[in-house]
Amino acid sequence: MASILSRLGSSRGQNSPLPPWAHSMLRSLGRSLGPLMASMAERNMRLFSGRAEPAQGEETFENWLSQVTGVLPDWHMPEEEKVRRLMRTLRGPAREVMRLLQAANPGLDVEDFLRAMKLVFGESESSVTAHSKFVNTVQEHGEKPSLYVIRLEVQLQNAIQAGVFAEREANQARLHQLLVGAEMSTDLRFRLKNLLRVYANEPERLPNFLELIRMIREEEEWEETFINPKRPRRAESVMERALSPMAFQSSPPIMISSIDCNVIEIDDSPDDSDEDVILVEPEDPPLPSSSASSFLGRAVSEDQVLVIESPNIFEIQAPSTSSGAGRKNNRGFGELRRARKRKHTIHCSHCGEEGHSKETCDNESDKGQVFENLIITLQELTHAEERARGAPGEPIGLSEPQ
């Protein structure tokens, strides 16, 4: 349109510009004729097949790439439409290779499309380099065999253009490298090895690129349908279960404030074992399970907290009392029993201190004071008895210690 405007302007003279309506009409005409001109340019593009000897109406890769580079700036359309138009200019092996590459990469744009074309059909490398790349192309970890074959085909075409293999040897070289560099099922590997052995002297009867892709895809679909869904999960070994932290996880400790409950000790009899019993009886009504977080988060001092570790506090039975009679615990969460060592405060009758019993008291420094207090107490009791005898109506009492 710019060339048309310049020609019209020059024909009318430099001092006679076009009226505004002419510019508007030409712009509308350009928008209408643009797709038609692009379609005509596409129809005039020569074809490319990738064969060693181009057929009638086909171009070499260099000529095809040159005309594509010249027409791309006039294609004002999305990338997908550009790739679709480029595919229309391909025939034969070139079309099949790029179709498979596009299927493996749905988001293929024009830049990647041309880069792949240059890699497969561009200038040939040296025969040593091309052969080395081909034989060193192996399947990557996690890569499907079908995608590996596409990658292998790129290196095979480069090797053919470099003169490493003849056209009739392509099927044999492709199949041999596939067996070397790919991981596949035992059945498919056996079938391909058998084909390679049977048609060793007739390589043209071996499966070509498209037939090989079809065989591999059928095998992959069969494995995904019948084998992968039935594959059992790996059984967890006994050692893994033993080392699991969940195997040693017990019930969380229950913190009970001494303000909310009474701790009752049941004295041991000579027949009892070394395990004592603690009865915890609440003064408040049981808390619902929804308030467990606030119950556990209550701020109390350390000497007012009793920690009881119990796997199931609702199924513990009450121990037998001093009379030997036992009863089941039917009070639910309120009554907790645990056969462990004493957790309550013990008062020593020997030295008057807390934290130990008379049998384990070793406070030698206070023994004299204890005896002195005992003598004073006995004297007061004697005096009180004498006063009671002297004055029968007077009440008996103990004088306050001085």
Curated annotation (Swiss-Prot):
Region annotation (Disordered) ranges: 1-20, 383-402
InterPro entries noted in UniProt: PNMA (IPR026523), PNMA_C (IPR048270), Znf_CCHC (IPR001878)
Cellular component, GO, one term: PML body
Quaternary structure, from the entry: Interacts with SMAD1 and CREB-binding protein (CBP). Forms a protein-DNA complex through its association with SMAD1.
Tissues where this protein is expressed: In embryonic brains expression is restricted to the ventral region of the forebrain, including the septum, amygdala, caudal putamen, and in the basal-forebrain cholinergic neurons. In adults, expressed in the brain, and at low levels in the testis.
Any one GO molecular-function label of the UniProt entry: zinc ion binding
Protein name: Zinc finger CCHC domain-containing protein 12
Similarity section: Belongs to the ZCCHC12 family.
Keywords associated with the record: Metal-binding, Transcription, Transcription regulation, Zinc, Zinc-finger
Zinc finger regions, CCHC-type: 346-363
Function of the protein: Transcriptional coactivator in the bone morphogenetic protein (BMP)-signaling pathway. It positively modulates BMP signaling by interacting with SMAD1 and associating with CBP in the transcription complex. It contributes to the BMP-induced enhancement of cholinergic-neuron-specific gene expression.
Gene Ontology biological process: BMP signaling pathway; positive regulation of transcription by RNA polymerase II
Taxonomic source organism: Mus musculus (Mouse)
Pfam families tied to this protein: PNMA
Coiled-coil regions listed: none
